[in-house]
Amino acid sequence: LTIDANGHWFFTANSAFNQLNIGDKVEETFTVSSVDGTPSTIKVAINGTNDKATVSSATVAIDETDRAVTTSGTLTSIDVDNPDNAFTPDSISGTNGDLTIDANGHWVFTANSAFNQLNVGDKVEETFTVSSIDGTASTIKVTINGTNDAATVSTATVSVDETDKAVTTSGTLTSTDVDNPDNTFTPDSIVGANGDLTIDANGHWVFTANSA
């Protein structure tokens, strides 16, 4: 503290006092005097405020499987006026799943379904907002990527008697596929040792023997 002959005084703190939180304070009293020696005091109080924490965020991507996926991680928080890595515990229900975070910043996301309907190139995303203990917000973004789930495809085993001409037989396969239209096949024409087989996009196949 400095004071001039006109009584104008000026106080400069010797640090930023960022460690002071709301409700904290430091006080100091300075004694000055008039020109005839009469003393007086100047009392300075520095009140704490909430200095915003520096909080990490998270962005994760996981592939869907045949069951509800789970992923987890840990956020960090650097806070000059609160304990580091202190978070507000929370449990958040989202559109694609639920997220929990504990006081140490450890979070866990659990999907609410297997998301088997997602094909390669498909995805669902969701962003959760969490906060450190001082209220500084951060986000956790979870992306679930689609994969190719194997279809359940029928087979066919047929037996035909030979005749005096090249025999023909046919049938239809079925396909159940969670991430593609059901009963969708790749058309093909296959030359075999005993005959030729064709199959169309609907799974209908025809075998024609190459001799009688």
Show the residue positions of the predicted features.
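Proline/serine/threonine-rich low-complexity linkers at boundaries of modular beta-sandwich domains
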Residues: 47-54, 147-152
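Acidic, turn/loop-rich segments in luminal/extracellular domains of secretory-pathway
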Residues: 1-48, 66, 75, 91-145, ...
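Extracellular ectodomain surface segments
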Residues: 54-93, 152-190
